[in-house]
Amino acid sequence: MSQNQEISKKEQYNLNKLQKRLRRNVGEAIADFNMIEEGDRIMVCLSGGKDSYTMLEILRNLQQSAPINFSLVAVNLDQKQPGFPEHVLPEYLEKLGVEYKIVEENTYGIVKEKIPEGKTTCSLCSRLRRGILYRTATELGTTKIALGHHRDDILQTLFLNMFYGGKMKGMPPKLMSDDGKHIVIRPLAYCREKDIQRFADAKAFPIIPCNLCGSQPNLQRQVIADMLRDWDKRYPGRIETMFSAMQNVVPSHLCDTNLFDFKGITHGSEVVNGGDLAFDREEIPLQPAGWQPEEDENQLDELRLNVVEVK
């Protein structure tokens, strides 16, 4: 066997392993939050970025082995930004044989008309885009709207709200839309961005640049993203543990009187969540809780339940 064949064989092995991990992550998120149900018609919002391409690919893959029946329709909003490659997504989706709809709305022109030069356009653009996608979901008769946000996006949102908003609020894997008419799901909620990036690179998706509108990146979010990436490099397992913390909230040991009845504590009240250790500090694990090095993931695979019959 030639050296090139050896490399190709290794690359394929790594891609299969990566795809299996992404499928498992998505399958677990779907099961944990009951994201997809029998007969669902899912509107997959496709921007042309790595996240939405990966979401569509994994959902299509799971569709073949899932114990329930559901359908997918990919939707892209062409906002008429200068230089937007209109042919890329239709060609890609037709090649896959995926049902799709390209919605053409000149939101770019509206934003440029309403927002003074030099001011950020993201807020108005987001509101316009959201309204159009909600309308499209109704027109297509879809039961769920799938967005491509991943675990890193969720953590970034948590820290943005903590640092700048004064609240512990992240990005929900599943919730009712703000208009009260649609269920929004995020199937990539358990997926790492670095896994998605590696998968997108290996699959060579036809990526569409995200800066066509000319807007500047969200500086606050970028600072948080850089901070999390730095932590991930310097302290392996910290990101995983922080995300686990979002799934293991202990209201009695926080300060929100809406979540826990502190005023109702009297002599004779039951001990809740271990009670207060008073002067003693809580014992903290030396290693991040629940984290395993990446090379140990084969062992973890044997212990986890493949909820969507990943093969």
UniProtKB/Swiss-Prot annotation:
Cofactor(s) the protein needs: Mg(2+); [4Fe-4S] cluster
Keyword 4Fe-4S: yes
Transmembrane residue ranges: none
Source species, domain of life: Bacteria
Motif (PP-loop motif): 47-52
UniProt cross-references to Gene3D superfamilies, sorted A to Z: HUPs
Annotated InterPro entries: Rossmann-like_a/b/a_fold, TilS/TtcA_N, tRNA_Cyd_32_2_STrfase, tRNA_thiolation_TtcA_Ctu1
EC number: 2.8.1.-
Pathway connected to this protein: tRNA modification
GO molecular function: 4 iron, 4 sulfur cluster binding; ATP binding; magnesium ion binding; sulfurtransferase activity; tRNA binding
Keyword Cytoplasm annotated: yes
GO cellular component, one term: cytoplasm
Alphabetical GO biological process terms: tRNA thio-modification
Annotated residues for binding of [4Fe-4S] cluster: 122, 125, 213
Cofactor remark: Binds 1 [4Fe-4S] cluster per subunit. The cluster is chelated by three Cys residues, the fourth Fe has a free coordination site that may bind a sulfur atom transferred from the persulfide of IscS.
UniProt cross-references to CDD domains, sorted A to Z: TtcA-like (cd24138)
Cellular localization per UniProt: Cytoplasm
Keywords of the record: 4Fe-4S, ATP-binding, Cytoplasm, Iron, Iron-sulfur, Magnesium, Metal-binding, Nucleotide-binding, RNA-binding, Transferase, tRNA processing, tRNA-binding
Biological function: Catalyzes the ATP-dependent 2-thiolation of cytidine in position 32 of tRNA, to form 2-thiocytidine (s(2)C32). The sulfur atoms are provided by the cysteine/cysteine desulfurase (IscS) system.
Subunit description: Homodimer.
Name by which UniProt lists this protein: tRNA-cytidine(32) 2-sulfurtransferase
Species of the source: Shigella flexneri
